Amino acid sequence: MKLMKVLIVGSGGREHAIAWSVAKSPKVDKIYCAPGNAGISEYAECVPIGAMEFEKLADFAGEHDVDLTIIGMDDPLVGGVVDVFEARGLKVFGPRKNAAILEGSKAFSKDLMKKYGIPTAGYENFDDPQKALEYLHTQAKFPIVLKADGLALGKGVLICNTLEEAEAGVKEIMEDKKFGSAGNTMVIEEFMTGREVSVLSFVDGKTIRTMTSAQDHKRAMDGDKGLNTGGMGTFSPSPFYTEEVDEFCKKHIYQATVDAMAAEGRPFVGIIFFGLMLTAEGPKVLEYNARFGDPEAQVVLPRMKNDIIEVMEACVNGKLDQVDLEFEDNAAVCVVLASEGYPVKYEKGIPMYGFENFKDKDGYYCFHAGTKFQDGQIVTNGGRVLGITAKGKTLKEARKNAYDATEWIQFANKYMRHDIGKAIDEA
């Protein structure tokens, strides 16, 4: 059997977790990552090509006989990187542009759910700020949610408690274009209350296999205060994702989404991330993502028993029905170490110490996000710097282990939340 060469596109903690998973596969003997980071370089040869440089990425894959390219990030998927690879006959894991719209346009995904009866919050789409304001003045119930239609680094969602806040939000998203063209269209949707749960899945266009559940912590500060971020920590599994919830979602949400995309002529191959809200009326879809979550990947992949390459190849080849996913009967918690001041303003280039503490420690992981090498020293290079993941027999044990391990790394402006997984105590 010829061993495989794999290219991973991206540079975050999610891509580090993917690289770690791929490195365990006996089918693989060479991993490249574009552009990668300091941690990924332990498993992969990092190449200085940006995630949005589609032609260069495809050239590289062709020239280096890459057998499979894995796209980690949302921007290139929504931009059509998969189509560029497929046009050259290169094997690539991820949805085409016409399917990545499931994440790329919130208005599209809301209309899809409405058309196919997939449970979600009530909403209206607007491309005219005056009409949006008129709706807010005449029909809105507060609190209400405003969402920029396009990609906005997970930050284009505003929860408005009053009409004044909502008016300011319309101005910010649609007139001041705080999120650029992502705000050309805006979704106004009813505010849902309940527990949030994330479920990741592999999809081959027809068949869907769900992974274990996880729960994210989006706000920057303890007590769910502060600004929305890309995610400050996660735990898996979610104790609130019961068998009953799973049954409901299998019946009304998961396969229904895959079938809806196929019926629209947009067969989805890759990862669908279901952001769910467990409401009093039952589970509803908050959002879809077309790739692994970050930091959800950092708690889900370490618990997966399968060879990730086998599963991804099954997706690309339309044979996912032959695969059963298996997860360890344990728990994992990830605490993000960020730069003080994230997500607004923060210093970069600060030296970090303590990585050797993770050597040969079973069940402890240090996934790199915003890191790079500078004169042989690992320094900070972003807002979210590292994801410290630990496993345990129970969620409480995993949480204690993860927080213990956060002490193993030092850097001057280290910041983290101290209440990741507090909901575990409420289960």
Predicted regions and their residues:
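Short acidic-hydrophobic, aromatic-tinged amphipathic segments that line or gate anion-handling sites
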Residues: 46-52, 124-128, 160
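Active-site "cap" helix and flanking loop/linker of ATP-utilizing ligase/carboxylase catalytic domains
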Residues: 250-272, 289-361, 374
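Internal nucleotide-binding/catalytic subdomain
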Residues: 157-297
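ATP-binding N-terminal substructure of ATP-dependent carboxylate-amine bond-forming enzymes
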Residues: 1-97
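Solvent-exposed alpha-helices and their adjacent loops that cap or buttress functional pockets
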Residues: 23-24, 39-41, 93, 115-117, ...
